[in-house]
């Protein structure tokens, strides 16, 4: 937020949430330019003057863009203008790409200001551990053992761009900016290009913001239904069509229900409900009966279809019983394992046995999916038999070894929370043997002869990093290599999924 304060003065626009005037400020373009350079140089910024000045900001191009926005009549532009008319050496493709880049930066301003003001000047505590993907698994270990059902939901994408604009309208009260956004979406992108274009980092950021607004709108309604679930019935879905004054309508609805329909209320409020969203999916875990879980499934489907006008199939919502079904969650197959226990109890002179069952959170590695990813990347065949990586044979030996070691350590790091390490051993075996076959093929040697010459060096490279990490976790009184294979380890520094893990 400090970078916004350095470029802008918010007092006028902040009061009315006007975003449109920001499109005419050169400082905003400088801010968008800085964001473009901070993307690891994976693409050139659209505000650069020419290819010979990769770090030079062009004020002339910015002035021309501002003039074009100011003079443009968005109501009379045709599709032919979009594809043919040049603009100072640039096409309208460049013009709309710039608008999307600016909108991605400008629209963050009111949300950031709202977040800062909500803390009342207090310093926001930073917890980097909560940013880790693994931080959710200790929570599930503690909570899922008391629950029995999980709804696995695939969040649908909006099938029409107008739905995204309408969703943003609930949070941005600036009609001019929304009209400009709607115009750019319809003129620059068709539906297919909007969802598949990933070459431009700025457009991807722009899409992610619209999608997150769409999901936040859905979650705000869902959480409201969750809190009021003891009063709301499926017959009341008609009042949810309009988001404006939503809470006022729902409060009025509750008063009517309480006063006039007290005898027919369906009370099914359950405090043991947990919600997690990840990678376009969400799970709803609860301690409910199958009937109540089907009710929640019914609410999900109707919320998307009738409120968001998105076609949502029943097959996209799965009801999993944790004691029987596996939940495919963030690269793990999670379930509840029932461990029978026999306890001997003695009372005075009589002794008897008590049969008990303990629930444990079980996490397994989806080995079939990972082998499929390995086969796609040519580390092994479809049966899991290691093969040489022919596309890497032009690299140096140290580079090839470093690539295999890095992949092996990343996967071992991520799947260290597995309950059983057998599948983890298989992953390491495939990568190590694939590495040996790649190097042996490069040097036109057999695997046996190559291992006799450099086998100890390869084994040391693969094991050194893992032993160093484990030695920091366990005390000296234990053997890290032995403890590692008996317990689950959750690392709090993992902020993204490896492509081989994210097989979807």
UniProtKB/Swiss-Prot annotation:
Q: Name one Pfam family in it.
A: MatK_N
Q: Which GO terms describe its molecular function?
A: RNA binding
Extract one GO BP annotation from the record: tRNA processing
* Compartments, as annotated in UniProt: Plastid, Chloroplast
Q: Which InterPro entries match?
A: Domain_X, Maturase_MatK, Maturase_MatK_N
Keywords, sorted A to Z? Chloroplast, mRNA processing, Plastid, RNA-binding, tRNA processing
Look up the record and report any one GO term of the cellular component aspect.
Answer: chloroplast
Give the record's family classification. Answer: Belongs to the intron maturase 2 family. MatK subfamily.
Biological role: Usually encoded in the trnK tRNA gene intron. Probably assists in splicing its own and other chloroplast group II introns.
Read off the PANTHER family from this record: MATURASE K
Q: Mind telling me what this protein is named?
A: Maturase K
Q: Which gene encodes it?
A: matK
């Amino acid at each position: 937020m400090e970078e916004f304060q350095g470029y802008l003065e918010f007092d006028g626009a902040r009061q009315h949430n006007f975003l449109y005037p920001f499109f005419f400020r050169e400082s905003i373009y400088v801010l968008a330019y800085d964001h473009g350079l901070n993307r690891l140089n994976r693409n050139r910024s659209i505000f650069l003057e020419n290819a010979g000045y990769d770090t030079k900001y062009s004020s002339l191009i910015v002035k021309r863009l501002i003039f074009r926005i100011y003079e443009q009549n968005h109501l009379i532009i045709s599709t032919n203008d979009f594809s043919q008319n040049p603009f100072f050496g640039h096409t309208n493709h460049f013009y709309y790409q710039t608008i999307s880049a600016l909108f991605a930066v400008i629209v963050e301003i009111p949300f950031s200001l709202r977040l800062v003001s909500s803390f009342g000047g207090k310093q926001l505590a930073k917890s980097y551990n909560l940013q880790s993907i693994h931080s959710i698994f200790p929570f599930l270990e503690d909570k899922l053992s008391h629950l029995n059902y999980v709804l696995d939901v695939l969040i649908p994408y909006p099938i029409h761009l107008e739905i995204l604009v309408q969703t943003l309208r609930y949070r941005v009260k600036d009609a001019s900016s929304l009209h400009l956004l709607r115009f750019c979406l319809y003129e620059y992108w068709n539906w297919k290009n909007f969802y598949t274009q990933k070459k431009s980092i700025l457009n991807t950021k722009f899409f992610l913001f619209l999608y997150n607004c769409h999901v936040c709108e859905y979650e705000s309604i869902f959480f409201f239904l969750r809190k009021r679930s003891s009063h709301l019935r499926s017959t009341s879905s008609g009042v949810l069509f309009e988001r404006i004054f939503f809470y006022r309508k729902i409060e009025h609805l509750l008063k009517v229900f309480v006063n006039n329909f007290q005898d027919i209320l369906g009370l099914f409020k359950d405090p043991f409900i947990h919600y997690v969203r990840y990678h376009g999916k969400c799970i709803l875990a609860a301690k409910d009966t199958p009937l109540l879980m089907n009710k929640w499934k019914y609410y999900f489907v109707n919320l998307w279809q009738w409120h968001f006008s998105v076609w949502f199939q029943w097959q996209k919502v799965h009801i999993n019983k944790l004691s029987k079904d596996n939940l495919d969650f963030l690269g793990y197959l999670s379930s509840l394992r029932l461990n029978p226990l026999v306890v001997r109890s003695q009372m005075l002179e009589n002794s008897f046995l008590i049969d008990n069952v303990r629930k444990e959170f079980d996490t397994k590695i989806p080995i079939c999916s990972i082998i499929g990813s390995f086969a796609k990347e040519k580390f092994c065949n479809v049966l899991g038999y290691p093969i040489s990586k022919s596309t890497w044979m032009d690299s140096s030996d140290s580079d090839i070894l470093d690539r295999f070691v890095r992949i092996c350590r990343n996967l071992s790091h991520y799947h260290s929370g597995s309950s059983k390490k057998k599948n983890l051993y298989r992953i390491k075996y495939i990568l190590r043997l694939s590495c040996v076959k790649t190097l042996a093929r490069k040097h036109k040697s057999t695997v046996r002869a190559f291992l006799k010459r450099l086998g100890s060096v390869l084994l040391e490279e693969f094991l050194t990093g893992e032993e160093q990490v484990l030695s920091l976790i366990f005390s000296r009184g234990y053997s890290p290599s032995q403890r590692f294979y008996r317990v689950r380890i959750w690392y709090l520094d993992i902020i993204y999924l490896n492509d081989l893990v994210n097989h979807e």
